[in-house]
Amino acid sequence: MLILLGLLCLYTGLYVARTYWRLRHFPGPLVARFTDLGRLWWVKTSRSHHHHMGLHSRYGQYVRLGPNMISISDPDAIPLVYPIRPGVPKSDFYRSMMPYTRKGRSLPLVFNTRDEDLHKRLKTPIAHLYSLSNILTFEAFVDQVLEILFRQFEERFVPDQAPFNLGNWLQYFAFDVMGTMSFSRRYGFLEKGRDDTGLLSAIWAFMKAAAPVTQMPWVDLVWNKNPFIALFRATPAQPILNVVLSRINDRRNELYSTTSTPEKVNERDFLSRFMHIQSNSDTIPPWAVTAWSFSNVIAGSDTTAVAMKTLWYNLLLHPATMHRLRKELVQAQQQSKLSHPFPAWNEISGLPYLNACVNEALRIHPPFCLPFERIVPAEGMTIGDHFFPGGTVIGMNPWVINRHRPTFGEDADAWRPERWLEDPARTRQMENTLLSFGAGRRVCLGKNIALLELKKLTSALVLHYELEIVNPEKFQSQNFFFFKQEGLYAAVKRRSAGSPELYPDDAVPH
C-alpha cells in the first residue's frame, strides 16, 4: 500500500513539474501553476466569468488558469483554436458534460463528444434540420406559442398591471416553443404559469453538478460518473432523460397503434425526423434519437431563454433603445410590411436596429461562459508569438472575447446596440469575433432556432405591449457554464397606439 502511495505521489510530482516547466513562461495566478483547484473554485462561486475577465485584465491575452490550461483572449486566435477542419480536438471538459445514466453509461451528444468519427456520425445526418430554411418550417409553431403567451398576459397581468416575473415567462416561452418543435407537444409551462414537471430545476441541478468538475475531469469520474454511487442516488441528468424518454416512448406507441409511417406521424417535428433518419441508416448509434432529443431539451431551450432575458432586461433598462426599436417596427408596420398579429421572419430579419439589439444581447451576455477547451495536437502549435506544446489545453471564454476592446470599442462593458450600425467593415469584424455560439466546425447547431425565437418574440412584444421594469437592481446571474438569471420583474399594459389590438376586450380567446 505504501509503495502504491509512493508511486502515486511520484507520478503526481513528475506531472506537476513537467507541466509547470513547459508552460512556465505563461503568466497567471500562483495556484494555477500547480493545481486546477483554483479554476474549479471559480466555477463553484458561479462568477467564473468575472474571475476570468479580471485575470485577463491583469495578465494579458494569454493566462495560465491551471497546470496544463491556457486561456486566450486574442480574437486573431479564433480560427486556430477553433478551425473548420479536424485536428484540434475537444478536451475532457466535454466528457464531464455528458449525461450519465443509472446503467453506468455516458450519453454522448453532438455538442460534447470528443470522438471525431462519432461526432460525424451524430451530426452529419441531422445538420440540415438546423439550417435556416428548415427552421423556418417551424415558424408556425412559434406563432402558436406566442398566441398562448399573449393570451396569458391578457388574462393574468394586463387587467391590473401588477408586477410579475417576466424572466420566468420568457423562459416558459422558450421551453414551450422547443417542446412544440421537438415533440409537437408543449410542456404546458405557459398555460399553468409554472413548471410542474421539474424540468427546469433538473437542468439547473445538472449544470451545477457538471460545470465545476469540467475544470478537474477526474473528479467527475469519481463523483458524478461513479457506478457505485449511482446505485444510491439519481444521477443529475436522470430527470431530464426521463422527460426525453417519455416523449420518445409516447411517439413509438403512437406509431404502433396506427398505420401511419414514421414520416407521417407528426411529420413536421424534430422527433419524427430524428426517428426517420435513424431508421434509414445502419451507421447511426441506436441511442442517437435520445441524444438528439436531449440536446434539444437542454441546450435548445435554456440558452435561448438566457438571450431573451438579457435582451429584455436591457431594452427595459434603456428607454432610448426601446424607443428606437419601437420606432423601427411601427414604421415597418405603417408601411404594411409586417403581418398581424405576429410579424414573419422574412419581414423582420433585415431590420437593422432589431438585429443590432439581438447582436448586442448575445455579445454582452453570451449563453455559455466557460472557455471552450481544445487540446493542442501532438506536434504543437504556434499562436501569436507563443508556442504551445502538444497536449496543452487551450480555450477562449465568450464573456472575455465579446469584451475585447480593440474589436468592440472602449465601451465594450456597456450596452450600446449602435456599435453594430456605425461602420460596415467593423461590423463584419465584430460578427467574426462574436463567440456566443462557438466557432469553427463545432459551432452551435441551435443558433438559427435562437435567432428565430428572439426576433419574433421581441418584435411582437414591442408592437403590442408596453412593459416597465420593476426593481432592476434585483436582476442577477449565476454562471455554471449555462446561466441562471433571476429577478427580472416588470409590469405590462397594452399599447395605446401604433398597432391594432391583439385581442379586443370582449374577445380574449380561451
UniProtKB/Swiss-Prot annotation:
Transmembrane segments: none annotated. Keywords: Heme, Iron, Metal-binding, Monooxygenase, Oxidoreductase, Signal. Its EC number is 1.-.-.-. GO terms for molecular function: heme binding; iron ion binding; monooxygenase activity; oxidoreductase activity, acting on paired donors, with incorporation or reduction of molecular oxygen. Its cofactor is heme. SUPFAM superfamilies: Cytochrome P450 (SSF48264). InterPro entries: Cyt_P450, Cyt_P450_CS, Cyt_P450_E_grp-IV, Cyt_P450_sf, Cytochrome_P450_monoxygenase. Pathway: Secondary metabolite biosynthesis. Residues 1-17 form the signal peptide. Pfam families: p450. Belongs to the cytochrome P450 family. PANTHER family: CYTOCHROME P450, CYTOCHROME P450 MONOOXYGENASE PKFB. Cytochrome P450 monooxygenase; part of the gene cluster 41 that mediates the biosynthesis of an extracellular and diffusible metabolite that is able to stimulate colony sclerotial production. This is Cytochrome P450 monooxygenase AFLA_114810. The lineage of its organism: Eukaryota, Fungi, Dikarya, Ascomycota, Pezizomycotina.
